Every structure is written in structure tokens, then in C-alpha cells.
């Protein structure tokens, strides 16, 4: 009888651990779906829940930054971009978004520093860096 009880307890614990591992992905995927449907408040909630289960999920921070960009809350946008880069320093999308914020704030030295980093890590968005550098020259 005690063997069965131990097996049942171990089985339930394994299910619980597996459920927590999957829940983070479910929250992020649901948040992404809501974000793509422009339901930003609901998406924000899901990304925040994703972060609760996995504080090192750089994509959740990135999408929170995008939501704050839509809501014109630059302070929170920048905070989430910084968190993204703390976790994933080579995230070209986060670097690019910070460069745009730097341009808006006329912080040209920061933009140049970020541009150098961006040049080293860019894979998909390399043309965007050229546009920003042209804006700096003007």
C-alpha cells in the first residue's frame, strides 16, 4: 500500500513540475497571439505572467517594451528593453528600439555606442542601422 502511495505522489509531483515548465510557454504564446490581435492590455498581462514563471524570458520583456511603445510610455519601454538586453545582450531588435529612443531624446553618444554594438550583432535588421546613422548625420 505504501509503495502505491509513493508512486502516486511521485507521479503527481512529476505532473506538477511538467505543468509549470509548460505554463511559461503557454503564457508567452497566448500573449503573442493577443499582441498580434492588438489586445495590448490582455497581452501585457500574459507576458507579465510568463515572466513570473521564467524571469529570464527575454522575449516577454521585449514584447512588454513593444506594448509600452504603443502606449507611449517611454520610461517603461526603456526599462523593459534594458531587461531584455541584460538577459540577451545580442538582441538586435531591443538594441534598435533603444537607438530610436536615444534619437528621440537627442542622446547621440548613446545612439553611436548602441550602433557599434548593433553592427556586430545584426543579422536581420542591418538596414535599419544605416537609416539611423543617416539621421544622425543630418
Enumerate the predicted regions with their spans.
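Register position in tetratricopeptide repeats
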Residues: 36-37, 70-71, 104, 135-138
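Residue-level recognition of tetratricopeptide repeat
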Residues: 57, 91, 125-126
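Canonical tetratricopeptide repeat
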Residues: 63, 97, 131-135
